[in-house]
Amino acid sequence: MSHIRNFSIIAHIDHGKSTLADRFIQMCGGLSEREMEAQVLDSMDLERERGITIKAHSVTLYYKAKDGITYQLNFIDTPGHVDFTYEVSRSLAACEGALLVVDAGQGVEAQSVANCYTAIEQGLEVMPVLNKMDLPQADPDRVKEEIEKIIGIDATDAVACSAKSGMGVDEVLERLVATIPPPTGDIEAPLQALIIDSWFDNYLGVVSLVRVRHGRVKKGDKILVKSTGKLHLVDSVGVFNPKHSATVDLKAGEVGFIIAGIKDIHGAPVGDTLTLSTTPDVDVLPGFKRIQPQVYAGLFPVSSDDFEDFREALQKLTLNDSSLQYSPESSDALGFGFRCGFLGMLHMEIIQERLEREYNLDLITTAPTVIFELLLKTGETIYVDNPSKLPDLSAIEDMREPIVRANILVPQEHLGNVITLCIEKRGVQHDMLFLGTQVQVSYDLPMNEVVLDFFDRLKSVSRGYASLDYHFDRYQSANLVKLDVLINGEKVDALALIVHRDNAHYKGRALTEKMKELIPRQMFDVAIQAAIGGQIVARTTVKALRKNVLAKCYGGDVSRKRKLLEKQKAGKKRMKQVGNVEIPQEAFLAVLRLE
């Protein structure tokens, strides 16, 4: 036990977590030269393409330290993106320590601060590491000062290394073995194991990644899942080094996988406790708080035949990504689909892309919305996540929108732009701290504004230097209205938006203009209108294509020409009454990209 170290790596996006993980694997001989490739742990295609870590990955390595003892290192590479904080908090629950990796050129960023606080709250030992020391712009002294000022942990003897060139990595491992405490637990006690993550394998059933707190588990044991009360027979146990490798057993303090032929997708939920069937009254370990989705959007299969496949794909994905929630919904314009809850826009894009790639589905997404709290005149409070479910305005006493507390870290020279952006998004400044060359501003912003494009805009006004971390704070009354889009006088439910009254005219105009570009021209005029209640606030028309019916007339009598034109006009009028307009997929997403 005293030779085991469990730790995870926390850092902001692009500060070199995954590269550092590669170096660890290389130094401890986890893979042969041939199998070694950049970012070994980012195994999903999507992760490699976007260069981000989405899922937390676990690896077990054996490191022979300078004192001659071989240590077993179980480490978990975690995502750095604000949308995946949940993955991080789960990984931390399985560890005794964390490496805080900071880019020595860029300094501390908002995301590392947030994840670091999570680690300190869970009582982990945090060890700062300065990465990218081989870069010319590295400034270790300034960064150490920032770590002390912003996060408040002692960084005077932070290890300096460069994961790319491999400089100082052995020093990191030595320091790690010395500072991070070994796990506590009793091998002889009854089995108690926490499920950190699980995924579905078509051949093996549910594979669970577990951290064993007490006792041991081996092949052939009967295990009991505490929340479902079901018994399963263990087929195999083992660790990732980084490949699957089976071991005899998993003992207290270790992190590894258990395969027990569970075929039911909800058979081993994340955050659950496993024990042996002989000791069913073991205490349940404190799991993780269920995270509430912040953004909701409708996902619909393009062809309605795919609906069942889509449901199955969602079930399998929910197992692997427990922060995704979904419920069936139907729309007049799009047929049957699901209303899904996500943690943020990036999460939504990733899920949609994973569904399309891994399960070969064609999907249409509607504009994302947040949850609104409504107080009805009857005195009851309801929560609405879908604009088309909004009750009549006359029945509503008060509408409240979710407000987030956003912490933004930005270099001083970009501060003005960031403040302008926050004001434009109806933000209220809460506090401002000057820390060295950086400023930490905190704002209360309506989540509705943050969800759509705030992150991208923030990056562009600050040339990529600002970083953002936000969390839900409260609901607050606001003057909100529902903006409907009518195409040829018919409401399209999938295009409705809930907006602030002050922005409603502007949003309506922008939306109709955008739709005009995207809806293809028909043989008749198509009117696109934006309405608040019964009042039309904006209108554009997609002009009809018309055939020149007078082409064959040459000279001739005006009454002949008039007859042909009247006939064309009558035809167009008839067409307009029965014609319906196909709305392309881009039009539904136009709502996202309103400047």
Swiss-Prot record:
Membrane topology qualifier: Peripheral membrane protein
InterPro entries assigned: EF-4, EFG_III/V, EFG_V-like, EFTu-like_2, LepA_C_sf, LepA_CTD, LepA_IV, P-loop_NTPase
Record bears the keyword Hydrolase: yes
Top EC class for this record: hydrolase
GO terms (BP aspect): positive regulation of translation
Enzyme Commission (EC) number: 3.6.5.n1
Principal subcellular localization: membrane
GO cellular component: plasma membrane
Alphabetical list of CDD domains matching this protein: EF4_II (cd03699), EF4_III (cd16260), LepA (cd01890), lepA_C (cd03709)
Keywords: Cell inner membrane, Cell membrane, GTP-binding, Hydrolase, Membrane, Nucleotide-binding, Protein biosynthesis
Residues involved in GTP binding: 14-19, 131-134
Record field: catalytic activity: GTP + H2O = GDP + phosphate + H(+)
A Pfam family annotated for this UniProt entry: GTP_EFTU_D2
Domain tr-type G: start-end pairs: 2-184
Subcellular locations according to the entry: Cell inner membrane
UniProt GO MF annotations: GTP binding; GTPase activity; guanosine tetraphosphate binding; ribosome binding; translation elongation factor activity
Keyword Cell inner membrane: yes
Free-text function comment from the UniProt entry: Required for accurate and efficient protein synthesis under certain stress conditions. May act as a fidelity factor of the translation reaction, by catalyzing a one-codon backward translocation of tRNAs on improperly translocated ribosomes. Back-translocation proceeds from a post-translocation (POST) complex to a pre-translocation (PRE) complex, thus giving elongation factor G a second chance to translocate the tRNAs correctly. Binds to ribosomes in a GTP-dependent manner.
HAMAP family for this protein: LepA
Similarity section: Belongs to the TRAFAC class translation factor GTPase superfamily. Classic translation factor GTPase family. LepA subfamily.
Protein name as it appears in the record: Elongation factor 4
Organism listed in the record: Pseudomonas syringae pv. tomato (strain ATCC BAA-871 / DC3000)
Name of the coding gene: lepA
